[in-house]
Amino acid sequence: MKEILPGIFSWHEFSEEKQLNFNGYLLVLEGESVLIDPPGMTEEAFAKLGSLAGKISKHPLQAILLTNVHHERECDEVRKRFDAPVLINEKDEAGLEGKADKTFADGDALPCGLMTFKFENQKSPGESAFFQKERGVMILGDALIGKVPGKLNMLPPDKYRDSKLAKKGLSKLLDYEFESLLVGDGESILMNAKEAVKVFLES
C-alpha cells in the first residue's frame, strides 16, 4: 500500500485472467477515511491499513464503498476486521454475493468529501463514480479501465447490452473538473486525466 496522491493510498492484486491489476484505494481526510473496491490484501497491507484507518487511528474507517456489483472483492474480510459498513449504489444491491449494510443513490454525499453519481447503460445498472472536488480526483470501477499507461479503454463490447450507448453515458464525466482519474482495473492517470477522457470519448 503506497500513497499515490496526498491522502490517497493504493494497493493492487494482479489478475492473471485479465492481465491487469485490480486496484483498491484508501482515502484519508480530516479525521476520517474510506476504502474503495478493496482487492486482496496481505497481512502487511492489513497492518498498514490498521495504522492509517483503524479505530484508534487519527482517521477511523467510515465506510467501504463499492463502485459496482462486481467489485465486492475483499470487502467482507475488511468489514469483519474494521467493523465498517459496506455501501453500494441502490441499483446494484440485489446482485451482490454478500450483503451491503447501506445503499447510496445518484448525487449522494459520502464520507471524505466524496460525491457519487451513476452512469447509464453500463455493465451493471448501478455503476458509479466517486468524485472528490477539493482534490480534483475522480474514482471509477468498470466505467473505464487502463490497459495502457496514459490511455483509457472500456470493457469488451460483449460486457454491455449496447456498447455505443455505454460510451455515450461516459460523457457525464466531462461535467466535472478533475486532474486525476483512479481506475479499478489497470493503470490510473494522475495528471491531465480529464483530457485523456476527452481523447477516448472522441475516438
Task: Indicate residue ranges for each PLM-predicted region.
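Short, compositionally biased "basic patch" segments
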Residues: 1-28
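Metallo-beta-lactamase
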Residues: 4, 15-17, 32-41, 55, 59, 77-126, 133-135, 160-174, ...
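Amphipathic coiled-coil/heptad-repeat helices and related helical stalk/stem segments
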Residues: 20, 45, 71, 165-166
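Intrinsically disordered, low-complexity segments enriched in small residues
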Residues: 28-31, 35, 48
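Active-site metal-binding motif and surrounding structural segment of the metallo-beta-lactamase
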Residues: 43-91, 180
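Short glycine-/acidic-enriched loop or helix-start segments at secondary-structure transitions
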Residues: 45-46, 74-76, 97-98, 149-150, ...
